[in-house]
Amino acid sequence: MGSRCAKLSTGHGPAQNTGHSRGHESSMKKLVACVSQDNFSLSSEGEEEEEDEEEEEEEEEEEEEEQIPVKGKLLLLEPEKQESAEDGEAQPSPEPKQTHS
């Protein structure tokens, strides 16, 4: 994977010296080709490795899922408390204003 990219990147080095505009165009095309080659090699060669990684990630995700509902409940409770506090403050505040006027 990396070796292919290295060869391509070194190949477009002298091309930039001959013409900057052409060099940039060719380098971009070669970069795209390099990326596509990496994707193909990853999808074909790395399937077995990815499966092992996914199993580890699933275990971590399960722990996160257990924590998310707890956080969600806390987040839901916080706005309710704020609203009730605002309502409590909002109701008595107009009363003194009325007495002043």
Swiss-Prot record:
Places the protein is found: Nucleus; Chromosome
Keywords carried by this UniProt record: Chromosome, Developmental protein, Differentiation, DNA condensation, DNA-binding, Nucleosome core, Nucleus, Phosphoprotein, Spermatogenesis
Any single biological process term in GO: spermatogenesis
Region (Disordered): 1-101
Chain positions found as Phosphoserine: 93
Acidic residues: bias regions: 45-67
InterPro entries associated with the record: PRMP3
GO MF: DNA binding
Top-level division of the source organism's lineage: Eukaryota
Summary of the tissues where the protein is detected: Testis.
GO cellular component, one term: nucleus
Family designation: Belongs to the protamine P3 family.
Role, per record: Protamines substitute for histones in the chromatin of sperm during the haploid phase of spermatogenesis. They compact sperm DNA into a highly condensed, stable and inactive complex.
Name of the protein this chain belongs to: Protamine-3
Name of the gene encoding the protein in the UniProt record: Prm3
